[in-house]
A protein has these predicted regions:
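Gly/Pro/Ser/Thr-rich low-complexity, intrinsically disordered segments predominantly at protein N-termini
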Residues: 1-193
Length: 193
């Protein structure tokens, strides 16, 4: 007979890293484990369109590093009860902020917030409230710019430090890197393919 398993009330990075590869994606929010299904095709297609354009610009101008593939970042604040690890669909880190090797042997999460975080909404993942909360958390913990991309509505919400809420781009608008990624501009039409 199977024995019942005790689920920890507060998760740590070490516990997150020890989870088996079971086809789900996981994040930690102040010690709380969040489980999400993998994203769908449109999610990957739109993410790739942004990644190519952004990577080309960043490499050409030697601005830093672009990472893709649900990369996890350790956003735990000093003294915070419970670890926080969030994964970004796409992220950019300026050259002068490229993360050092992990502080603990065996961990894969860098202890910084990227300068730019891109989240592509997927019907199988968070709803609007969940992605808004996630974007706010990125900005509150140090990201300089956040883009939440909604493929089904062809809208991008832009999040910036100091703003009470996001602003939405649609139609003929362009994504701009601003001070975070100088000179970067991408028409939304390119994102949708």
């Amino acid at each position: 007979m199977a024995q019942p398993q005790t689920v920890p009330s507060t998760w740590t990075i070490e516990m997150l890293e020890s989870l088996p590869d079971d086809g789900w994606q996981y994040a930690l929010v102040e010690g709380r484990l969040v489980r999400m299904p993998p994203p769908g095709y449109d999610h990957g297609d739109v993410g790739e369109n942004i990644a190519y354009a952004l990577s080309d610009h960043v490499r050409a101008h030697r601005l830093g590093k672009v990472v893709v593939g649900e990369t996890g970042w350790d956003l735990t604040r000093p003294g915070e009860e419970g670890d926080t690890v969030q994964a970004s669909d796409l992220a950019f880190v300026r050259a002068d902020r490229l993360p050092p090797p992990p502080p603990r042997k065996g961990t894969t999460y860098r202890p910084i917030a990227p300068d730019l975080v891109v989240e592509v909404a997927s019907p199988s993942q968070f709803g609007r409230d969940g992605l808004d909360d996630q974007a706010r958390r990125w900005i509150e913990r140090g990201a300089g710019l956040g883009w939440v991309v909604w493929p089904d509505r062809k809208i991008v919400d832009v999040w910036e430090p100091g703003a009470a809420d996001s602003r939405s781009l649609a139609g003929q608008d362009e994504l701009e890197g601003g001070a975070v990624i100088p000179g970067f501009r991408l028409p939304l039409s390119v994102i949708w393919g």
